[in-house]
Amino acid sequence: MARTKQTARKSTGGKAPRKALATKAARKSAIVTGSVKKVHRFRPGTVALREIRRYQKSTELLLRKLPFQRLVREIAQDFKTDLRFQSAAIGALQEASEAYLVGLFEDTNLCAIHAKRVTIMPKDMQLARRIRGERS
C-alpha cells in the first residue's frame, strides 16, 4: 500500500485528527494509475538529532508562556489564595524552570549512556536526581 506524505502541524495538545475515509479511496485509485511518488523518509533518529542541534542553538523559551503561567498560579493556590504575579516574576520562574529541566535531562541522558543505552528511562532520572542530592 502506498504511503501518503505527512505535513508538519503544530500540536494542539488534543487527540490527533482522524483521516477522512475519502483518502483511502483516493489512494487506491492512485495505485492503479501508478502516479504515486515514493515519500522520502529519514532514518530513525536523524530528525531527533536535528531537533537537538536546533534547540541547543536557540535561546527562546521552550515551554509556552500561558500554560506555564497557569501551572504557576495553580501551584501558588495551595499556599495562598488571590496571589498576584508580575509578568517579570513569571518570566524569571520560567527561565529558572527551563534551565533546571534542561540540566536534569542532560544528566539523565548521561546516566542512560553510562548504562549503554540511548533511550532515557525513569530510573535514569531518579539516579541523576539522587547523585545531585535532590532526592535520597
From Swiss-Prot:
Gene3D superfamilies on file: Histone, subunit A
Q: What is its main location?
A: nucleus
- Function as written in the Swiss-Prot or TrEMBL entry: Putative variant histone H3 which may replace conventional H3 in a subset of nucleosomes. Nucleosomes wrap and compact DNA into chromatin, limiting DNA accessibility to the cellular machineries which require DNA as a template. Histones thereby play a central role in transcription regulation, DNA repair, DNA replication and chromosomal stability. DNA accessibility is regulated via a complex set of post-translational modifications of histones, also called histone code, and nucleosome remodeling.
Superkingdom of origin: Eukaryota
Biological classification of the source: Eukaryota, Metazoa, Ecdysozoa, Nematoda, Chromadorea
Q: Where is this region: Disordered?
A: 1-20
Q: Which CDD domains match?
A: HFD_H3 (cd22911)
Q: Which residues carry this modification: Phosphoserine?
A: 11, 29
Q: Which GO terms describe its cellular component?
A: nucleosome; nucleus
- Mind listing the UniProt keywords for this protein, alphabetically? Acetylation, Chromosome, DNA-binding, Methylation, Nucleosome core, Nucleus, Phosphoprotein
Q: Would you tell me the protein name for this molecule? A: Histone H3.3-like type 2
Molecular-function annotations in GO:
DNA binding; protein heterodimerization activity; structural constituent of chromatin
The protein's organism comes out as Caenorhabditis elegans
Give the matching Pfam families: Histone
Record's keyword annotation contains Acetylation: yes
* PROSITE patterns linked to this entry: HISTONE_H3_2
